[in-house]
């Protein structure tokens, strides 16, 4: 369902990667966001307006499959009042909301979702927000390189759709998303081999 109050808003999305630290630094430096959206257990440790948790609640409540996230989610899920977008409802999580998958997929003409974060990007595109500020979305999983590469590719696919729609995308400085943490002189393949490499930066006006 379209929420008119989200159209044109400035949104922060915070996930569990190291660059989540840049979110807290941004608050220290007086940055303000219309809403903060958390990914999974970030909702339990950061004040969020919405949380995206596309795994079924039972993954956290009935199994240990989520590893070290399990304990904090078991404490938080039954008690929070923060809206949690997920794939199925569970009476033990009273604030859970079904993610509007069909509406989002139809509106964005895509159903490419191989991890939780792209669901938040697609929701933002569907709601026509003005800007996304991305923190903790790093995909630096040393033990599962394939998952990291696949997840990053899916996220960057959705960010491309957001950019094409005119959305402003800001990525945390220490995140590898969109090669943001790469030295600026190394971001243009081939040119990076020159003694004096060209540097190309696209600003929010597209110039």
Residue ranges: model-predicted function:
Residues 1-207:
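Metal-ion/cofactor- or nucleotide/acyl-coenzyme-handling active-site neighborhoods
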């Amino acid at each position: 369902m379209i929420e008119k109050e989200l159209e044109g808003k400035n949104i922060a999305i915070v996930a569990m990667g190291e660059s989540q630290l840049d979110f807290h630094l941004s608050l220290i430096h007086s940055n303000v966001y219309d809403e903060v959206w958390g990914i999974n257990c970030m909702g339990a440790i950061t004040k969020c307006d919405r949380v995206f948790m596309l795994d079924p609640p039972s993954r956290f409540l009935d199994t240990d499959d989520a590893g070290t996230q399990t304990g904090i989610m078991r404490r938080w899920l039954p008690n929070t009042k923060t809206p949690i977008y997920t794939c199925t409802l569970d009476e033990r999580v009273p604030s859970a909301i079904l993610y509007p998958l069909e509406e989002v997929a139809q509106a964005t003409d895509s159903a490419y979702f191989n991890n939780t974060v792209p669901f938040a990007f697609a929701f933002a595109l569907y709601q026509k927000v003005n800007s996304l500020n991305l923190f903790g979305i790093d995909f630096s999983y040393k033990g599962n390189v394939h998952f990291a590469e696949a997840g990053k590719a899916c996220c960057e696919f959705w960010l491309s759709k957001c950019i094409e729609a005119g959305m402003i995308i800001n990525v945390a400085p220490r995140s590898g998303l969109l090669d943001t943490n790469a030295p600026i002189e190394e971001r243009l393949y081939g040119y990076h081999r020159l003694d004096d490499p060209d540097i190309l930066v696209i600003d929010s006006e597209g110039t």
